[in-house]
C-alpha cells in the first residue's frame, strides 16, 4: 500500500467529543469517524486491525472445535418473550416493529436465537458436545454512549455458545474457552487478567471477565498477588473471607439525638463525635415488586450488584427523595431501620453485627444512638452487599487485596439450563430420557479489544500497536521522494518486505520528512524504515522501533531477516 493511495485522513487537533486516549487517537490517526452517538464508520486502517483480531479469534475458536455460523441481527420478540428477557433486558434493548406491527429486537446477544436453532436440530446425546460461534455486529441502546468504541451502541463481537450433555461437559467446554481466551489476548499483545465477575442480564452461575489493565478502565479489579495466590475479581463480585462478629460491648438504651442539618456520614460523625464504623447507613431502594432498605456500615458503600442478586429482584434503583419521604417520613439522610414498616431490610454482616450503632431516626434533623440489630429492629436477610476495598483481606489467602483499573474485553459464562429449559432445548440421553441441553456462552468484544490495545499501548505521539494486530508492520519513508536514488531504494525495500510476507506502507507523499515521521508515530506502525542519502550511499537502512524509540542500522542484504526478528519481539 502506498500512502498517497491510503484513505487515512489524519487530524492534528484532538476532537472535543473524545474523552479517552483511544477515542482521540482513533479519530486523529484516521481509523474511525463518528456517524451518530455511539455509532462509527471503520476506515481502512481500522478494518485491517479488526480483521487481524478476528483472525486470531477464529484460529483459537477453531482450535477448540468451534464451528462458525452467522445468525440474524433482527430477532423476533417471541423468542425473547419465551425466555423471559423481553421485559427484563430493559431500555438497552433496541426494539422495532415491521410493517405488519410485529415486534422485533436488534440483537445485543444471541442466546435465544441459538437455543431455538439447537432446539430444532439437536435431539440426541450423540450430537453433543457442540461449539457454535459467530462474529457479528451487536446493538445496545446505551443511555449515554461514551469513550468512543468502549461504550458504543453498535459494536463487533464474537460470541460462542457451547452445548453439552451435563455440568461435567460444561466444565470442560468452559475451561477450553478460558484457555482459548488466554491465548487470544496473549497473541494480541495485551497485558490482561481474568477475574471473577457477576453474570448480569445474561444469567447463569460461574463467570469470568478478561480485563485489559489500563488506568482509563471503567471497571475496578481487586486482586491478590501474595503467597502465589491468583485471586482476582471485579469489584462488583469481590467477596469477603469472613463475617463480622458482635463485640462484647454491653448494649445501652436507644436514645434520640438532634442532628440539625446533618445528612451525610461525615456530618453526623463530626456532630456526634463517633467514628464512621459506628454508623449504620440505611439506603432505600425500589425493585419491580417491593421497597428495600439496605444497611451497611458508615464507612462502607452498598454494592448494588450484590444487593440485586441477594434480593432476587430483576431490577433495582435507588429511591428518589419523594419515595424516601413517603416510606420513612423523613428527608434523605435521616432514614433508619428502627420502626420502618412495609420495607424488607437486607443488612451486610458488619451492619448486622453492630453494637450501640448510630442510625437515622426517620425524622428530619434527628438520629438514634445505641441502636442494636435484633433488639431494636428485625433484619429480613443478612447478605454480603457491600463494596470490598483495596487493603482488605483476600478471601482465599488473607493477604491484602490490591486495586487496578481494567477494560473488559471478554467474558465467559456457565449458563446451565437457564435458556434450554425456558426455550425447550432438550436431547435424549443413552437411556432414552429427555434432558435439557447444558449451555455456556463466551463473548469477545472485537472493536473494544482494538480500543483497549490503544489504551494500554500509546504515548504522547500516538498509537504503539502490538505487531500482531498492527494495520501494517512497517512504514518505509524516503526522505526526499524527488531523489531518484532514495525513491528507487525505498521501492526495493517495500517490494522485498511484501515478498517476505511483511506488510509495509511506502510513504510516497511529497510531504516533508518531519510530517511523515509524525504521521507514522500517530498511526503506530511498529517499525519505521528511513531511506536517506546515507542509506543509498552505504546500502544501509535505518530502522526505528516505535515501542521504545531505538534505532538500528541494517545492511540491505540482511533486511528481511532483521525485520522479521524485530517484529517477533513486538
From Swiss-Prot:
<protein>
    <recommendedName>
        <fullName>Proline--tRNA ligase</fullName>
        <ecNumber>6.1.1.15</ecNumber>
    </recommendedName>
</protein>
<dbReference type="InterPro" id="IPR044140">
    <property type="entry name" value="ProRS_anticodon_short"/>
</dbReference>
<dbReference type="Pfam" id="PF03129">
    <property type="entry name" value="HGTP_anticodon"/>
</dbReference>
<dbReference type="InterPro" id="IPR002314">
    <property type="entry name" value="aa-tRNA-synt_IIb"/>
</dbReference>
<dbReference type="InterPro" id="IPR045864">
    <property type="entry name" value="aa-tRNA-synth_II/BPL/LPL"/>
</dbReference>
<dbReference type="Pfam" id="PF04073">
    <property type="entry name" value="tRNA_edit"/>
</dbReference>
<dbReference type="InterPro" id="IPR007214">
    <property type="entry name" value="YbaK/aa-tRNA-synth-assoc-dom"/>
</dbReference>
<dbReference type="InterPro" id="IPR050062">
    <property type="entry name" value="Pro-tRNA_synthetase"/>
</dbReference>
<keyword id="KW-0436">Ligase</keyword>
<keyword id="KW-0648">Protein biosynthesis</keyword>
<dbReference type="GO" id="GO:0140096">
    <property type="term" value="F:catalytic activity, acting on a protein"/>
</dbReference>
<comment type="subunit">
    <text>Homodimer.</text>
</comment>
<keyword id="KW-0547">Nucleotide-binding</keyword>
<keyword id="KW-0067">ATP-binding</keyword>
<dbReference type="GO" id="GO:0004827">
    <property type="term" value="F:proline-tRNA ligase activity"/>
</dbReference>
<dbReference type="InterPro" id="IPR002316">
    <property type="entry name" value="Pro-tRNA-ligase_IIa"/>
</dbReference>
<dbReference type="GO" id="GO:0006433">
    <property type="term" value="P:prolyl-tRNA aminoacylation"/>
</dbReference>
<dbReference type="InterPro" id="IPR006195">
    <property type="entry name" value="aa-tRNA-synth_II"/>
</dbReference>
<dbReference type="GO" id="GO:0016740">
    <property type="term" value="F:transferase activity"/>
</dbReference>
<dbReference type="InterPro" id="IPR004154">
    <property type="entry name" value="Anticodon-bd"/>
</dbReference>
<dbReference type="InterPro" id="IPR023717">
    <property type="entry name" value="Pro-tRNA-Synthase_IIa_type1"/>
</dbReference>
<dbReference type="GO" id="GO:0005524">
    <property type="term" value="F:ATP binding"/>
</dbReference>
<keyword id="KW-0963">Cytoplasm</keyword>
<dbReference type="Pfam" id="PF00587">
    <property type="entry name" value="tRNA-synt_2b"/>
</dbReference>
<comment type="function">
    <text>Catalyzes the attachment of proline to tRNA(Pro) in a two-step reaction: proline is first activated by ATP to form Pro-AMP and then transferred to the acceptor end of tRNA(Pro). As ProRS can inadvertently accommodate and process non-cognate amino acids such as alanine and cysteine, to avoid such errors it has two additional distinct editing activities against alanine. One activity is designated as 'pretransfer' editing and involves the tRNA(Pro)-independent hydrolysis of activated Ala-AMP.</text>
</comment>
<comment type="similarity">
    <text>Belongs to the class-II aminoacyl-tRNA synthetase family. ProS type 1 subfamily.</text>
</comment>
<dbReference type="InterPro" id="IPR036754">
    <property type="entry name" value="YbaK/aa-tRNA-synt-asso_dom_sf"/>
</dbReference>
<dbReference type="GO" id="GO:0002161">
    <property type="term" value="F:aminoacyl-tRNA deacylase activity"/>
</dbReference>
<dbReference type="InterPro" id="IPR036621">
    <property type="entry name" value="Anticodon-bd_dom_sf"/>
</dbReference>
<keyword id="KW-0030">Aminoacyl-tRNA synthetase</keyword>
<dbReference type="InterPro" id="IPR004500">
    <property type="entry name" value="Pro-tRNA-synth_IIa_bac-type"/>
</dbReference>
<dbReference type="GO" id="GO:0005829">
    <property type="term" value="C:cytosol"/>
</dbReference>
<dbReference type="InterPro" id="IPR033730">
    <property type="entry name" value="ProRS_core_prok"/>
</dbReference>
